[in-house]
């Protein structure tokens, strides 16, 4: 029998609807977005443009490492601790499956460059970036994201954060 109400779902799963302060708790499903899987179809940034928008003052970027410390996971952690999001956490939260980053697969590099570009053009307010002292030549931060952020009239300030020391430095202010 298909589940038709929240009560049906919770009666099967938990035995009752959860209650807080004597009021039923309405469950919120974890992802309201339908899955877009770019490992199964050609990348089209227009399909995800709307999903890559962020609230003002919440966008984080990342690039490079300092003494081996840095990368996506460190940036996600710092962003979360400061109430922000990264491109990757936004992608995860909106049910997008991107191709794995691979220098040897030009379509992978292009997909990530396009997603980064759209993310950077839609952010607003104060932007923070976890940027290490060791950056790969041709990195997306210096070549795509930073120029796009500086050209974005809705960006008021860009602050970098060293992934090892946590030292913050304002690099752009409007």
Regions found by a protein language model. Give the residues of each.
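Catalytic toxin/effector domains delivered as secreted proteins or via bacterial secretion systems
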Residues: 4-174
């Amino acid at each position: 029998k298909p589940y038709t109400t929240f009560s049906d779902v919770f009666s099967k799963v938990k035995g009752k609807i959860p209650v807080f302060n004597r009021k039923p708790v309405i469950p919120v499903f974890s992802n309201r977005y339908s899955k877009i899987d770019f490992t199964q179809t050609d990348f089209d940034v227009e399909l995800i443009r709307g999903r890559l928008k962020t609230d003002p003052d919440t966008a984080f970027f990342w690039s490079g490492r300092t003494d081996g410390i840095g990368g996506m996971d460190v940036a996600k952690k710092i962003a979360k601790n400061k109430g922000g999001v990264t491109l990757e956490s936004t992608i995860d939260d909106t049910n997008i499956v991107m191709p794995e980053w691979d220098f040897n697969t030009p379509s992978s590099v292009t997909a990530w460059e396009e997603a980064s570009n759209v993310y950077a053009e839609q952010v607003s307010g104060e932007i923070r970036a976890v940027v290490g002292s060791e950056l790969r030549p041709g990195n997306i931060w210096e070549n795509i994201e930073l120029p796009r952020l500086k050209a974005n009239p809705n960006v008021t300030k860009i602050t970098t954060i060293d992934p090892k020391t946590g030292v913050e430095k304002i690099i752009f202010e409007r």
